[in-house]
Amino acid sequence: MTDPQNPAQDSAMTAPVTLPTDLVADAVEAYDRYRYALENGLLIQNSWHQELDGRQLACALGVLGGAVNGPNDCPAQIMPRWLARMVPGFFDRMAPADAQAWGLALYEQLARLKGQVPFSVVYDWQATAVLEFWAGSLQRRKFDPETLATKLAQVETLRALHRKHLEGGAAPRDAWCEALRPIYAYADADAYADADADADAYAYADADAYAYADADAYADADADAYADADAEPTPRAEGETRADLKARRKAENIKLLGDGLVAALARAPAPQA
């Protein structure tokens, strides 16, 4: 019921819940903003911002502010550029409920780290999630024993380099090239090797672009094999086509890799007070 004696109060009561459009100041505020969006049904996928019935909606990065329309607009104090570039690929490709839960877990870790995310997270993620996933996918396929052993050995060689960097060591460019070429069939091994052998932050940003692209290719290749029933028995829901099955498997793979990234963030030490 309206209150003619207090129109301002009535207006406040009927105003739609919406997202603030001002830019968040730090990673803790970013977590609070994302949680607010989640709790009030203001998150969307595959679009940066959207207005609906007077409400401002946004994606996992768009919630940071109305001016955030791409990874390059993400403030550095929230997360590094290389991580911002990865977020849409995970958030937009998971099932909605999985994406929303993943985003909350991501921002929780960013708040804990105060936005100071070391690049070692990528080495951790590659060694413990991406390459582990790919090794498992290879083992489910119909390779002859010798071919499978060769492929798994190549995965282990590359994983050892990631672990070496994670533990504070370093490997020369040639070592990265030799390990990457047989594994990263979908990425530019030379460019990735240059970045991994270089301590420059901009090179690292480029390296991550290749790392994510290849992780996505692995997820897609595994989904293809799954949909073709080449690797294992593949139950389909009633009326589900091969394309449907592949899309479902791809979303599951992306979730697995995205969860692995959050787990790697959780293992990164918090900055000193």
Name every feature range the model reports, one short phrase each:
Residues M1-A273:
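Short, glycine-biased loop/turn motifs at secondary-structure junctions and
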